[in-house]
């Protein structure tokens, strides 16, 4: 399991299962999953059946064949080339490039609350054609069952944020979008191609971006910030600082120290990944995947 996204269930939702809904998935999974709780410390209860199935996602549900005239998307190729280098010890537990291009799945939910229209919006990614993974959107009235839309929104690992009455997004590999006429338009690229999942936090004119990088040893949670007072085309990410690395056994610290690779990992490893930010009453929480993709943790985050 990986790619967490946490919300406090809004008041407009009736018959809520708990105070908090935590969304996540298997990296190559067949559904978006959800767990609910009344306390961030748990206990968490897994909702049976998930909240959106692959069949209902409008993504591919069967492995596609490679077109004769296939030309790989340049952006996604650079992202894969920058990070696909599995250690021999884990080669059997990481999808091959061909599997990455053909395995139907949906994952990496980004769930936000639209209070004005009283709905819950979820962005998610998966395979739309051979070798091409993209983000789409789904909507729900209760957060328990989502209706997906056909339109492609952007690249994978979408995170959405607001600044000065405009909506923006950030995705792999470092793409900044601005929502214009109801569409997310790419306006900048502020990272190298080795960035994986991210979490975002806006404070005044600063955008804090929490992320991890494929190939790091161990893969850890980093943070860079962006001065948004400038026009988006001039946004630039600061040098990263370390936020969190595996220190506990349940985070993977007792496992071999090896560089990470692009794509899923199907055994426990010495890595933390997939940061997400949740704020409640000015308290900032960092969610992240532990032992590679072998669990989800929550930590309090202090920003000086």
Tell me what each language-model feature is:
Residues 1-108, 112-268, 279-304:
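Beta-rich carbohydrate-recognition and catalytic domains
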Residues 272:
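Iron-sulfur (Fe-S) cluster-binding modules
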């Amino acid at each position: 399991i990986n790619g967490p996204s946490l919300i406090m269930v809004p008041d407009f939702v009736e018959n809520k299962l708990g105070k908090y809904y935590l969304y996540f998935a298997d990296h190559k999974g067949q559904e978006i999953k959800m767990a609910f709780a009344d306390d961030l410390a748990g206990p968490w209860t897994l909702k049976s059946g998930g909240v959106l199935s692959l069949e209902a996602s409008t993504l591919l549900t069967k492995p596609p064949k490679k077109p004769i005239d296939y030309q790989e998307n340049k952006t996604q190729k650079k992202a894969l080339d920058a990070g696909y280098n599995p250690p021999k010890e884990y080669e059997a537990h990481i999808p091959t490039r061909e599997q990455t291009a053909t395995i139907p799945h949906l994952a990496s939910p980004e769930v936000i609350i639209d209070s004005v229209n009283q709905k819950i919006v979820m962005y998610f990614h998966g395979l739309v054609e051979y070798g091409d993974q993209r983000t789409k959107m789904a909507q729900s009235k209760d957060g328990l069952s989502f209706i997906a839309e056909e339109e492609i929104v952007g690249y994978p690992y979408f995170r959405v944020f607001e600044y000065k009455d405009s909506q923006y997004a950030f995705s792999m590999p470092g793409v900044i979008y601005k929502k214009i006429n109801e569409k997310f338009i790419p306006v900048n690229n502020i990272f190298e191609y080795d960035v994986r999942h991210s979490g975002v936090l806006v404070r005044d004119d600063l955008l804090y971006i929490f992320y991890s990088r494929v190939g790091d040893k161990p893969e850890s949670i980093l943070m860079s910030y962006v001065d948004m007072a400038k026009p988006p085309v001039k946004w630039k990410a600061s040098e990263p600082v370390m936020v969190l690395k595996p220190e506990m056994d349940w985070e993977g610290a007792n496992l071999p120290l090896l560089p990470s690779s692009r794509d899923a990992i199907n055994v426990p490893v010495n890595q933390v990944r997939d940061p997400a930010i949740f704020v409640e009453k000015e308290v900032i929480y960092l969610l992240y995947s532990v032992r590679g993709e072998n669990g989800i943790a929550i930590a309090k985050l202090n920003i000086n």
